[in-house]
Amino acid sequence: MDTDLSPQDRKDLDKFIKFFALKSVQVIVQARLGDKICTRSSSSPTGSDWFNLAIKDIPEVTHEAKKALSGQLPAVGRSMCVEISLKTSEGDSMELEVWCLEMNEKCDRDIKVSYTVYNRLSLLLKSLLAVTRVTPAYRLSRKQGHEYVILYRIYFGDVQLLGLKEGFQAVRVGTVGTPVGTLTLTCAYRTNLAFMSTRQYEWTQPIMGIIIDHFVDRPFPSTSHMHPCNYRGAEEQVLTYPAVEESQEVCTTSFSTSPPSQLCSSRLSYQPAVPGAGPSELGYPVALATGVSAGHPHQMMAPGKESGLPAVSVQPAHGNQAEHDRTLSVSPANVAGTTSSSEEADSPSGSSTTGAKSSPNKNTHVLFTRKVGAFVDKPSPQVTYASTDIPFAVFVPKLADNEDTDPMVVYPETPEEESPEARSLHSSCSSSGTPQDDFVMVDFKPAFSKDDLPMDVGTFYREFQNPPQLSSLSIDIAVQSMAEDLDSLPEKLAMHEKNMKEFDAFVDSL
């Protein structure tokens, strides 16, 4: 099988399969980051663009892929698999899909390694780039956040499809024939996304402390652990990866027609955190023109994982000034955090810093005069921006939605004019001396209401504060009613004597 291949073709084929496997892992994991990835195309690709695709490698993913491969290549009976799963904030997990790169024994002896295999692998990688966006896991990855995260796991060996449960679907992304076998890239994804908590099936702790499943072998004990696609816990250890990974080797083979250009790493090289940099110094974005490092004129400081400050090289590959002046966009796939450092930023006047920290007592104030439209009562305020908290105060937009609630707006101290109603209110309150004048009645006319309201709160309080005297307490009325009762007493007695028999009969009946 291998006798027909020359040593150079065999070396090129192994190299193509190796970097295709590494690039496939990058494409799958980056498709589950939850963010859209925008890559700027270039008319002059360099030798580091494998398979004619400018895929920005994540060093952590490349490290995990190489650790899973351990120097092996996908061959007959040996498959490289990438498992994508979902984990909730409560600890429940669910496998979503499994991507598998395997090889069978069907060979194509007449195919040319240098041209045909390389081009077909490039087409297969582009197909993978499209298929990763149409499976159900892609929609879930776009909605990940505090409730759940998407995890990935890379392992080498037999395909494990038990976690997908019943009803999973399998799709073949594509195949590429080689002189040593046929590479096949497939995907098995879960169709039943109804989540069922696995915590209800967990064993409860025995009373006697006996481990029930002590002699039960765990399934796949040698497989690697799950890793978050775009989430890193604070307790995880930050690993330092080299600036230029092995996957960024110049693609120079026996069929290369152009000389290898100077390799320029556009990836994030992880540097140790700057000592003395507080959280307030890492909370503002980095501008391209002001984020140039003093040590290297072609490096820009960009946010790294765990508040690290990686250096992004902006040196052009061919020395073109147009390539150097292009705006660099740092992909969230390469950056775990969302904060960036303003330590290396230039001052608004244009003077560049050399790493020394500016003293906090040197505050530069930038004054803006906001334009006020017609029919505005208050004068135009002068807005003062302190450059101690904002590194680039000149770039702060001059228009604000709400000036009253803006903490950075400083209005000049002007005496406030009181309205006549307010002056009358204060004068009435200050001149009040009797208990009846403690409450000042202000005419209140609510919108969409009648002017002749029968009663309001003030009228109600006034009436019950000074209630009228009870009629029963009046002496004249009491004397008059008693005289009337005495005058009518003989008539009542005569009526009682007249009806004496009826009253006696009523008493006897009781």
UniProtKB/Swiss-Prot annotation:
Autophagy factor required for autophagosome formation. Target of the TOR kinase signaling pathway that regulates autophagy through the control of the phosphorylation status of ATG13 and ULK1, and the regulation of the ATG13-ULK1-RB1CC1 complex. Keywords: Autophagy, Cytoplasm. The lineage of its organism: Eukaryota, Metazoa, Chordata, Craniata, Vertebrata. Transmembrane segments: none annotated. The gene is atg13. Residues 295-363, 413-432 are annotated as: Disordered. One of its GO terms (cellular component) is cytosol. It is found in: Cytoplasm, Cytosol; Preautophagosomal structure. Phosphorylated under nutrient-rich conditions; dephosphorylated during starvation or following treatment with rapamycin. Residues 338-353 have a biased composition (Low complexity). This is Autophagy-related protein 13. It comes from Xenopus tropicalis (Western clawed frog). GO terms for biological process: autophagosome assembly. Residues 354-363 have a biased composition (Polar residues). InterPro entries: ATG13, Atg13_N, HORMA_dom_sf. Belongs to the ATG13 family. Metazoan subfamily. The keyword Repeat does not apply.
